[in-house]
């Protein structure tokens, strides 16, 4: 969105820097190559990259506005799950009937390993949209069935697909998805 900007500078300095250092210091800075039997001053490739520009590039690339079937616009920060600041949101369907209590139990289990948010304000759809906009890859919804079957609904930010999973499996599912090795 900002036009063409340099993210990383790569400069072939050839032997200029080391050659001048050798010239003015009076010290030989050479490498002996045994395969060809010669000494030479090595070439230098200089790179420079700024974290702020890299971060801006990731954010700019991740921001999307999607048109939904109902005509509304969905704002999504589709940052890769391992890089997302908030990994999971815990959302009780309503603020009564024991759902917030179970949601807090789940939050307490997850919060030591993942940056989590708890939200019970507004409708579940509005809460999903808020989490989409800040880049939260997973929303865990606790509903009335959760009290009986000990399962929750996990909603994936990018696809909006939902799946029922056992509460006991939740931690390992999220761990697997937010593992940094997924993007390396």
Regions found by a protein language model. Name each.
Residues 1-184:
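NTP/phosphate- and nucleic-acid-binding module
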């Amino acid at each position: 969105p900002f036009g063409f900007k340099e993210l990383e500078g790569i400069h072939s300095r050839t032997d200029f820097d080391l050659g001048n250092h050798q010239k003015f210091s009076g010290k030989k800075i050479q490498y002996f190559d045994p395969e060809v039997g010669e000494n030479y001053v090595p070439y230098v490739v200089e790179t420079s990259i700024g974290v702020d520009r890299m971060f801006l590039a990731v954010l700019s690339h991740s921001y999307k506005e999607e048109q939904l079937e109902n005509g509304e616009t969905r704002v999504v920060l589709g940052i890769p799950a391992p890089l997302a600041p908030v990994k999971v949101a815990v959302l009780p369907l309503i603020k009564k009937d024991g759902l917030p209590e179970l949601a807090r139990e789940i939050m307490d289990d997850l919060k030591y390993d993942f940056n989590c948010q708890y939200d019970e304000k507004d409708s579940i759809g509005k809460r999903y949209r808020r989490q989409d906009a800040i880049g939260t890859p997973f929303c865990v919804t606790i509903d009335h069935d959760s009290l009986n079957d000990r399962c929750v609904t996990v909603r994936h930010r990018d696809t909006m697909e939902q799946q029922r999973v056992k509460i006991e499996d939740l931690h390992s599912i999220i761990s697997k998805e937010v593992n940094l090795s997924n993007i390396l």
